[in-house]
UniProtKB/Swiss-Prot annotation:
Gene Ontology cellular component annotations, sorted alphabetically: chloroplast
Cellular compartment(s): Plastid, Chloroplast
Keywords from the named record: Chloroplast, mRNA processing, Plastid, RNA-binding, tRNA processing
Function field: Usually encoded in the trnK tRNA gene intron. Probably assists in splicing its own and other chloroplast group II introns.
Gene Ontology process terms (BP): mRNA processing; RNA splicing; tRNA processing
Pfam families listed in its UniProt record: Intron_maturas2, MatK_N
Disulfide bonds: none
Primary location group: plastid
A molecular-function term among this protein's GO annotations: RNA binding
Name of the featured protein: Maturase K
Length: 506
């Protein structure tokens, strides 16, 4: 990375970032295809790292610019095993390296921005962190009235993406090469089915395109939000996942103050909160239904006129939070009203005070979890445990370790649930499925197998983190034990993506 930074520092004197020559550098592909950083289908091909050289890169780019550069005959694929994995392997190799290169100016600009504002930004790690959602759910969400559940539009024209990236990447040759990639993958951007299949093989490239695309959506939202807040609040900087965010927010503020100074204090708008996760975003407010319809109109209009994206209004749902549940991070969240009766007595007069406390319930979606377990052959569709025949050839310790890892991942991910008793059924299914798999391997019944080895064998491996904490702090006060039995949001839960998307594997 130091070599790359020295290269960009040299070119910065010319007021341009010439990234195109970096494509021909071999160490770029060492970074892009590092097994520890990006485990893609290319890195699984044995001998690929040794073949990523300047000669191959030049040949690939030359063939990409030919007339029929994406057509590979079956005979050529059989003769060369290196190209047999994928017909579009030419462009995939270059696009992954290209995605790594164009991220460099973004990263350097963000670092320089944070260095200049290190005295003003206390928690700079929250600038691009999803962890800020957890305290938001605990503290503020239960006090909101309406929620806009938005499906972010994914259909966009190729040239719109090019125009967006021109503000960040000044190298014309790199943009021309990007246009070649986007013309090939235009069907991936408009077709969700094809995009989900091929984006897994080139995650870095598609993540970069998606984030740069959504980045512009959120910039419009920041402008509208600051308008309703009279430019007095920049708390959205903690929630918005933005690159180079604070410099852009200053420019928006300066333009708005200059042109609309007379209208700043006319209308007082209620508080707005914004969350983005996966392909959805959420706008929540204490305002009225009319206020939320205004925001819906603003968003649809900006997408259609500024980004030339036809967006159906039905993709934005306005829900009253007290009557509808919200699906977020694999949880079903809704607001429950808990009555609380307080008895007060003043001298000889006693009276009761009824208070209604709004609390956010984060529930575990048991039905989708059981459906996922049934798809993976741990149980049937009704939730009755069954053996896992494909694991019967493994060793006993390996079988128990696999079942225990799945059980611990589910407990770890759903530790923020307000009603953890619903997880007992999932643990029961996994525990009994593990016992039946072991009994199938030893050609015995579950009762005989557990009687011979003891049920403690499974309990030791399937013990939840809550039980471990309780055993660790047995001698502490009861108040501390109650803390560990309450909702706990583990910050590494976002790495368990499979539980947030039940279409994936565990």
């Amino acid at each position: 990375m130091e070599k790359i930074q020295r290269y960009l520092q040299l070119k910065r004197s010319q007021q341009h970032d010439f990234l195109y020559p970096l494509i021909f550098q071999e160490y770029i592909y060492v970074f892009a295809h590092n097994r520890a950083l990006n485990r893609s289908i290319l890195s699984e091909n044995p001998g690929y790292d040794n073949k990523s050289s300047l000669r191959i890169v030049k040949r690939l780019i030359t063939r990409m610019y030919q007339q029929n550069h994406f057509l590979i005959s079956s005979n050529d694929s059989n003769q060369n095993r290196f190209w047999a994995r994928n017909k579009n392997l030419y462009s995939e190799i270059i696009s992954e390296g290209f995605a790594f290169i164009v991220e460099i100016p973004f990263s350097l600009q963000l670092i320089s921005c944070l260095e200049r504002k290190k005295n003003k930004i206390i928690k700079s790690q929250n600038l691009r962190s999803i962890h800020s959602i957890f305290p938001f759910l605990e503290d503020n969400f239960s006090h909101l009235n309406f929620v806009l559940d938005i499906l972010i539009p994914h259909s966009v024209h190729v040239e719109i993406l090019i125009q967006t990236l021109r503000y960040w990447v000044k190298d014309v040759s790199s943009l021309h090469l990007l246009r070649v990639f986007l013309n090939q993958y235009c069907s991936l951007i408009t077709s969700k089915k094809v995009s989900s299949s091929l984006s897994k093989r080139n995650q870095r490239f598609f993540f970069f395109l998606y984030n740069s695309h959504v980045c512009e959506y959120e910039s419009i939202f920041v402008f509208l939000r600051n308008q309703s807040f009279h430019l007095r609040s920049t708390s959205s900087g903690v929630l918005l996942e933005r690159i180079y965010f604070y410099i852009k927010i200053e420019r928006l503020v300066n333009v708005f103050v200059k042109d609309f100074r007379a209208n700043l204090w006319l209308v007082e708008e209620p508080c707005m909160h914004y969350i983005r996760y996966q392909g959805k975003s959420i706008l929540a407010s204490k305002g009225t239904s009319l206020f939320m319809n205004k925001w819906k109109f603003y968003l649809v209009t900006s997408w259609e006129w500024h980004f030339l994206v036809w967006f159906h209004p039905r993709r934005i749902c306005i829900n009253q939070f007290s009557r509808h549940s919200l699906e977020i991070f694999g949880y079903l969240s809704n607001v429950q009203t808990d009555p609380s009766v307080v008895r007060s007595q003043i001298l000889e007069n006693a009276f009761l005070i009824n208070n209604a406390i709004r609390k956010l319930d984060t529930l575990v979606p048991i039905i989708p979890l059981i459906a996922k377990l049934a798809k993976e052959k741990f149980c049937n569709v009704l939730g009755h445990p069954s053996s896992k025949p494909i694991w019967a050839d493994l060793s006993d310790s390996n079988i128990i370790d696999r079942f225990g890892r799945i059980c611990r991942n589910i407990s770890h991910y759903h530790s923020g649930s307000s009603k953890k008793k619903s997880l007992y059924r999932i643990k029961y299914i996994l525990r009994l499925s593990c016992a039946r798999t072991l009994a199938r391997k030893h050609k015995s019944t579950v009762r005989v197998f557990l009687k011979r080895l003891g049920s403690e064998l499974l309990e030791e491996f399937l013990m939840s983190e809550e039980d471990v904490l309780f055993l660790t702090f047995q001698k502490t006060s009861s108040a501390l034990r109650r803390v560990y039995r309450s909702r706990i949001w583990y910050l590494d839960m976002i790495s368990i993506n499979d539980l947030a998307n039940y279409k994936s594997k565990f």
